[in-house]
């Protein structure tokens, strides 16, 4: 009888322990001690350092693409290094701890009050290593956005983000561990913490919006561009890792703007200017060790795209693509009259859909139009690829927009910004008339946000630029980014952001666009804006916005040299 009673007791205990979702079991082994990165809402100014620390913890190796860190594939991460714990605390003192997978930055579980919850379909690696000293339970929904939004009853486009929302989310997760009640507030809280932690670590655009809301103690709802970033992180990562050395995508990244218009992105430069993507999901190992020829890079201050990787299962496949090429004043590279004859000049013309502006970038380093090669000679022309010296048909496209003929060391140049101008080869002086973009030929209209989350503004021709509080729809804060590397006043696109000279402390002003080296700018993946002619960075003078001076200066690593483009500044 005692044996029967004991068995009945154990059976009842097991049934009661199942709870609403079913208790999870795990072997009694000593779990790994995972690194921890915490954030307390009472310290609003610690949000940015918190994200930097989280990024540092999830990036285990030195794998990069275009200087962006690539997360390690699952096969290269041991169980003992698989997760990072993220305790979040609200002003009431409530704390919940998230478990984040270093392979993909996903939130896979959370814990508080001696209980932990895992999403439906959780893995043995998660259950056996996370929160093993708590009562583990499994939720009846997964952690993807579709499942979470189904639990809430509406999309995350309607769910505010900000300090108040994060406060409530922490309380909702903690309360659920106490009562195991309604899943709607739980799912809503998870949508908030996932975006304010994981997505902000993936995209500086999202980080900036959240950081601004925390600083201003305000709330905002995600715009459609932000949501499309979140939905396309995987495809962005894949395209970047499989891009040609100059950042030319094999496919198209589909985003949406705030008005729900489609944005088709075909190169890294435009994607970065739109999203400021900060971390990549592993897709494949790049086959290219460097995106530069020696001739194209020697004078550059920021060596942007360098691929580095270890031993991977999958190697990226780089394919040929056909795109338009935009240069000085937004004009496109065009075969004169579309004549298919050797020696026909290549010229500038307004961008259109004509076939004589469609260039195929081959993996052998040639750029072709209907099979004929873009050829370096006394001028730039098309020619039969088999009848000219091979070195005359080879080109290197750099991420900064330079197109170089490696044999001569000369770069593709537009002598004038006029329709019909024949292109030439000249020494590289990093001038705007030597800047090009492949694909995405239309200028991008944006705000430029810098030190103390303030916006860059212009005050007309021959005047300085400076920082002021961001104001949506203020035309003086709107800029057009051109494929030639110029930053133009959006309300008057004949005016360019210009350095007065090329020495440290030289002022940055607004002048007529002339295609000079003082008017060409590169948005770097480290958050700086460089002038490749001067080899200096855009800098808020003395870290004092009241001086109303933006200058050129040597790299310091200080926050007054950090910038981000955004279509929604406040």
From Swiss-Prot:
Transmembrane segments: none annotated. 1-alpha repeats lie at residues 329-369. 2-beta repeats lie at residues 493-531. The keyword S-adenosyl-L-methionine does not apply. Its EC number is 3.2.2.22. SUPFAM superfamilies: Ribosome inactivating proteins (RIP) (SSF56371), Ricin B-like lectins (SSF50370). The precursor is processed in two chains, A and B, that are linked by a disulfide bond. A small truncated form corresponding roughly to the second ricin B-type lectin domain of the B chain, TrSNAI, can also be produced. Glycosylated. N-glycans of subunit A are (Man)2-3(Xyl)(GlcNAc)2(Fuc) at Asn-40, (GlcNAc)0-2(Man)3(Xyl)(GlcNAc)2(Fuc) or (Man)1-2(GlcNAc)2 at Asn-62, (Man)3(Xyl)(GlcNAc)2(Fuc)0-1 at Asn-144 and (GlcNAc)0-1(Man)3(Xyl)(GlcNAc)2(Fuc) at Asn-260. N-glycans of subunit B are (Man)3(Xyl)(GlcNAc)2(Fuc) at Asn-492 and (Man)6-9(GlcNAc)2 at Asn-526. 2-gamma repeats lie at residues 534-567. It catalyses: Endohydrolysis of the N-glycosidic bond at one specific adenosine on the 28S rRNA. Residues 319-439, 441-566 form the Ricin B-type lectin domain. Disulfide bonds join 284-316, 332-351, 373-385, 455-470, 496-513. 2-alpha repeats lie at residues 452-489. Residues 1-28 form the signal peptide. PROSITE patterns: RICIN_B_LECTIN, SHIGA_RICIN. It holds the Pfam family RIP. It is an enzyme of class 3 (hydrolase). The active site is at residue 199. Keywords: Disulfide bond, Glycoprotein, Hydrolase, Lectin, Nucleotide-binding, Plant defense, Protein synthesis inhibitor, Repeat, Signal, Toxin. Neu5Ac(alpha2-6)Gal/GalNAc specific agglutinin. Behaves as a type-2 ribosome-inactivating protein. Strongly inhibits mammalian but not plant ribosomes. The A chain is responsible for inhibiting protein synthesis through the catalytic inactivation of 60S ribosomal subunits by removing adenine from position 4,324 of 28S rRNA. The B chain binds to cell receptors and probably facilitates the entry into the cell of the A chain; B chains are also responsible for cell agglutination (lectin activity). Involved in plant defense against insects. Tetramer of four pairs of disulfide bound A-B chains. The B-chain consists of six tandemly repeated subdomains. Only subdomains 1-alpha and 2-gamma possess a functional carbohydrate-binding site. Belongs to the ribosome-inactivating protein family. Type 2 RIP subfamily. This is Ribosome-inactivating protein SNAI. The gene is SNA-I.
């Amino acid at each position: 009888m005692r044996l029967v009673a004991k068995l009945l007791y154990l059976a009842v205990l097991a049934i009661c322990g199942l709870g609403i979702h079913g208790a999870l079991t795990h072997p009694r082994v000593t779990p790994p001690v995972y690194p921890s990165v915490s954030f307390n809402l009472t310290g609003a100014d610690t949000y940015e350092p918190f994200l930097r620390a989280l990024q540092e913890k999830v990036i285990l190796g030195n794998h990069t693409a275009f200087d962006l860190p690539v997360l390690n594939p699952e096969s290269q991460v041991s169980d003992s290094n698989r997760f990072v714990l993220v305790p979040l605390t609200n002003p009431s003192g409530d704390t919940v701890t998230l478990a984040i997978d270093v392979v993909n930055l996903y939130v896979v579980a959370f814990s508080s009050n001696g209980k932990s919850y895992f999403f439906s379909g959780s893995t043995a690696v998660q259950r056996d290593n996370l929160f093993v000293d708590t009562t583990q339970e499994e939720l009846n929904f997964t952690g993807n956005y579709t499942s979470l939004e189904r639990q809430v009853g509406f999309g995350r486009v309607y769910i505010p983000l900000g300090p108040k929302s994060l406060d409530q989310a922490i309380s909702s997760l903690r309360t659920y561990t106490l009562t195991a009640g309604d899943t709607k507030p739980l799912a809503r809280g998870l949508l908030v913490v996932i975006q304010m932690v994981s997505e902000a670590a993936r995209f500086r655009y999202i980080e900036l919006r959240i950081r601004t809301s925390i600083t201003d103690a305000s709330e905002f709802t995600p715009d459609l561009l932000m949501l499309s970033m979140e939905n396309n992180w995987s495809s962005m990562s894949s395209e970047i890792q499989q891009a040609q050395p100059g950042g030319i995508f094999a496919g198209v990244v589909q985003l949406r703007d705030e008005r729900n218009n489609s944005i088709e992105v075909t190169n890294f430069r435009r994607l970065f200017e739109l999203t400021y993507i900060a971390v990549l999901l592993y897709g494949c190992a790049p086959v290219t060790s460097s995106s530069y020829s020696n001739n194209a890079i020697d004078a550059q201050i920021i060596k942007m795209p360098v691929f580095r990787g270890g031993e991977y299962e999958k190697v990226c496949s780089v394919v040929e693509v056909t795109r338009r090429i935009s240069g000085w004043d937004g004009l496109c590279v065009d075969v004169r009259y579309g004549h298919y004859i050797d020696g026909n000049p290549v010229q500038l013309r307004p961008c259109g859909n004509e076939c004589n502006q469609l260039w195929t970038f081959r993996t052998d380093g040639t750029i072709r139009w209907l099979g004929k090669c873009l050829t370096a000679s006394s001028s730039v022309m098309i020619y039969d690829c088999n009848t000219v010296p091979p070195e005359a048909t080879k080109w290197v496209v750099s991420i900064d927009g330079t197109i170089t003929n490696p044999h001569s060391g000369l770069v593709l140049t537009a002598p004038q910004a006029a329709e019909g101008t024949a292109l030439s080869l000249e020494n590289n002086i990093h001038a705007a008339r030597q800047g090009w973009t492949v694909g995405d030929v239309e200028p991008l209209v944006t705000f430029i946000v810098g030190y103390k989350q303030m916006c860059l503004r212009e005050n007309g021709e021959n005047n300085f630029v400076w920082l002021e509080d961001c104001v949506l729809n203020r035309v003086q804060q709107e800029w057009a980014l051109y494929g030639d590397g110029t930053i133009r006043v959006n309300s008057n696109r004949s005016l360019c952001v210009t350095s007065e000279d090329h020495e440290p402390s030289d002022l940055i002003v607004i002048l007529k666009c002339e295609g000079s080296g003082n008017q060409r700018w590169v948005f770097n993946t480290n958050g700086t804006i460089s002038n490749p002619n001067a080899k200096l960075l855009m800098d808020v003078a003395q870290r004092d916005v009241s001086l109303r001076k933006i200058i050129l200066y040597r790299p310091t690593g200080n926050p007054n040299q950090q910038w981000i483009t955004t279509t929604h500044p406040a």
